[in-house]
Amino acid sequence: MIQTIRKAWGIPELRRKLVFTMLILLIFRIGNAIPVPYINTELLGNYIDSMSGTVLGLYNVMSGGAFAEATVFALGVQPYINSSIIIQLLTIAIPALERLARDGGEAGKKKIASITRYATVAIALLQGLGYYMICKNYNILEQSGIWPALVIIVSFVAGSSFVMWLGEQVNEFGVGNGISIILFAGILSRVPNMISMCASYIASKGSIGYLWIALLIVGILAMIVLIVHVNEAERRIPVQYAKRQVGRKMYGGQASTLPMKVNMSGVLPIIFAQSIASLPATVWAFVGTPDKDTSPVAYSIYSAIDTKSVLYLIVYFLMIIGFSYFYATIQFNPVEISNNLKKNGGFIPGFRPGQPTSQFIAKVLNKVTLFGAIYLGIVAIAPLIVGKALDNYSLAIGGTSVIIVVGVALETVQALESQMLMRQYKGFLE
């Protein structure tokens, strides 16, 4: 990775792109330090820390801690991610959107992007309103009234919209995927906090603390190696193209492959599963923890669905597997792939074009997705199990964060390598 960046730095055009990307990240970090007025950040930080296993805790991790500090960029890229997922699902459910995405070409892509932007602003407005209501209900506001409410909500909506714009600028003038890189920077900003927590844990546990932290570091390194290998792993189905004559020229006849990535859906199944699985705990957090003596039944239910319970881990793991299959079928439709192969004169050796081909692709997809889903589940719940073993010690960076950081790093390096390769070909042709 460092070697690739050094080589890219030697190319003037790529150096400008890298500098531009770093400037955008600097602006993002400055925005993360600007507080929104009328909110007591100390009380808010204590409240968010108590909600570490809920949806609010997930938002805090994804924003790099800005959510708990009530900064202008507190909502971060979450509204954009949510709107992208919703539009993606609506594209499948609504035929008009499906046709626009499939047959609209460049104009269709721009229209979908425009719809996603409007949806981002709408979701940011709802989340900003929810943020304000939490602060109001838990007496976190320093001043209440219509004007403070407007200032807080507008600040969050404007901040989220500006973050979306920053990501789009990186897409156009920088390197890699802008939203992913901003998410990457936000998560990495939590590393000093994690180091501080590790130091506190060692101080409280003594020599045994050193042993646990050493094992934790080894586990994180092993997880990174696993993520790198699985992210790059793919199943390649051989494809043969029939020869065809157009005029006096003969086309086709070459062999190719149909790549099928093991982790096709990325980190989305984990985000969706965590949001849904932690909803009961989030509701209990708002209602209040039931008393064990006065409400034993309610307390038993609360203990069963708590984010540190065994039942939660099982439900969370199964949800990740379910969402992995759901997203895999969305992104890799066997029937559509089979039809495209048939139209272009391609076929899989040993299988007739049409239904037999689609059935074979679906069978392979199910096997590959199962492995990828189990991998995602293990990576997601491993930090929770480790935290439970360490006396409910809460990790500042979990499995979801590690997958995002490693995935974005690999994606950015690949983008740099492809741009360097493109410029080598350009120089040769010139």
What residues fall within each predicted segment?
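N-terminal cationic and glycine-rich segments that engage phosphates or anionic surfaces
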Residues: 1-430
